Structure formats: C-alpha cells, structure tokens
Amino acid sequence: MNGHDQHDQHDQHDQHDGGRDAGQRDEPAAPRLDAAAFTTLRITEGEDRLHARLDRPEVRNAIDATMIDELHALCAHLEHTPKILILSGSPSTDSGADGADPEARPRRGVFASGADIAQLRDRRRQDALRGVNSTAFDRLAKLPMPVIAALDGHTLGGGAELAWAADFRLGTPALRVGQPETGLGIIPAAGALWRLRDLAGEALAKEILLAGRILDAEEALAHGLVSEIHPSQELLDAADALAGRIAAQDPLAVRISKQVFAMPREAHPQVDNLAQAILFESEAKVDRMQAFLDRREARQQDPEPNREQNREQTTSGETA
C-alpha cells in the first residue's frame, strides 16, 4: 500500500464520518476489507468481528511505517463499519544471533517487539511532531466497538503501547511486557506515558517507564495489565470467546458505553443521562426487554423444563 494514498483515503473517511454520533443508526455494511492489499497485517473478517494479525515475523512484528499506514486503513474501515477488533501477532521467525535458517528454528510467540529501530533511528524532529505512532494508536483506541489484544511473548515498546490502546488484553505464560525506550534515548510517546498511570498505578508505571522494568505474565496479571492468561495454543480461542460475549450484547449499547466510559469525570452524570435517553428510544431496547419478560413469564409458568436454561442464563449474567 502506498503511504500517501492511504493518508488521502483516511482523510476522506474522516470527513465522511466526522458528523456521525453514537445514537445514529449504522449505514448499510460497507464492502469488506481487501485482505490481499495488506502486507504487514493478516486480516480475517467476520460479520461481527475482525481479526488483524501483525505479520512481520522475521523482525518480531516490529511496527514500521507501512504497518502504521495499514492500521490507519483498518481503523477507517472499522469507523465506517463498526466491528469488534482482535489484534494478535505472528510467531517470530527471527534467525537470532546464531544466524540459523529461520525455517529451521522453533517459532516463538510474539505480539510486537516495538517500533522498527532502523526507521526510528532515522526519524527527526518533524517526525516526532507528526505523532506517527501515537496518532494511529489513539485512533485505534477510539474505535466504536471494543478492541481485544491477544498478547503472546514479547510485547515491548511500541508493541506495548499498541496493547495499552486496546480495551481488553489477554496474555500467555510467555508474555513479557514493558517500555524500554529510555534505554534508547527516547520516551514512549505513543500513549504509555499517560495510559500506564491509569492502567497500573503511578508507582508501577514509573518503574516501567523510568527504570525499564519488564513484567512477566503473572506480574502483568497481578497488576491488571492483562485480565486473563491462557496457554499459547488457546489464546485466540479465548479472544474469540470474549468477542462472542461482547457480540451477544446490543451493539449500540456497547458503542455508547465505550464512549461514555472514556469521558472525563466532570462530564458525568450528565453524559450518562443523555446516552441513556438515546438508548431508551431504540427499538433494540424494547425488543430485548420484551424478550426478557417473555422468557421470565415462560419460566414462571413451566419452571421444571427451564431449570437448565435458568442455570445457563444465571451463568451468563442474566437475571430475572
């Protein structure tokens, strides 16, 4: 993909979507992404979710300018056609220090080892002021539907900042996550300096940001940086299961909840009341509540055959 063409497309999408608000109905579904046009992301798109796999395994999925362009294209599509996004990384085929044939080495899990250092070394003041990575990650964080990051192995530098932009993070026992930028003479300027304070608390955030602390999976789980740990071979199934639970909710209610959650404290409770006013007028609210009442009435009239169903609904969080 050509970077300049991509940015022109992004501007067109932004101008087209800029006036939409969360209460408006979605337009008819746009055509699906042309997965073959992407070179650094592997795209699998379904009806309610899209899986994007970072795919530069020879450099441990380092984030380069092309990947940033493709993340913008991905965001433009999901802004126009809201779906749950699952992010993951291709296993590494990096030959390592021994120079062995990548095909002969065992493939190790990796989400993203950071920004492409060769490109980063050559960037100058004007590149920093453009916010190359931060703009893309912030756009991803503001997508209408939730973003799930499935983290296996190294999740460092820009890779960690991409993960912090997600709404949910799942990991594997091989997870190693941190921000080593200060050791390279720069700062993590794509979101870690302000997102980590909220995610991990000030004390741990400073250890990660100022002292280069790298957390393993259990530490990341204990501090809430990931919500679940799964064996590597089960990670994507777990991400899909989470996406399925989200997809079972009303899409508009999910989208509005995500937007309201991100509002500053001083916007509440007024913004909550306005959001609820939108949802109170939606057909989905009436339909879903009527279906709930119908199920409850059926259980009350004939409770025995519905005992197993009651147990399943209680497990899923539904109550009568």
Model-derived regions, located:
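Conserved CoA-thioester-binding segment of acyl-CoA-metabolizing enzymes
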Residues: 1-6, 18-106, 320
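Intrinsically disordered, low-complexity repeat/linker tracts enriched for polar/charged residues
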Residues: 1-25, 297, 301-313
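Intrinsically disordered, low-complexity segments enriched in small/flexible residues
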Residues: 23-31, 279, 283-291, 317-320
